[in-house]
């Protein structure tokens, strides 16, 4: 696999997990700051735990990728 392809795959993975992190944060923000959103779920604690786990998993994946593979040259923006 070429260096360019490797960089693109790395960038795609980071972007994927950042999107998952953003989604989880957005959902948790709604639950924490909007009582209307909370009223729709009878089991709010399980929902909060589910989204907290998704947030933690995404952050862990990003950290793991950066720790193990960030020594690659920076990916050009564009």
Regions found by a protein language model. Name each.
Residues 2-78:
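Extended, charge-rich alpha-helical interface modules
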């Amino acid at each position: 696999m070429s260096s360019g392809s490797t960089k693109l795959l790395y960038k795609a993975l980071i972007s994927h997990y950042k999107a998952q992190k953003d989604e989880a944060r957005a959902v948790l923000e709604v639950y924490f700051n909007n009582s209307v959103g909370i009223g729709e779920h009878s089991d709010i604690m399980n929902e909060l735990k589910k989204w907290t786990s998704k947030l933690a998993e995404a952050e862990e994946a990003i950290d793991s990728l950066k720790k193990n593979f960030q020594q690659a040259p920076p990916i050009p923006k564009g």
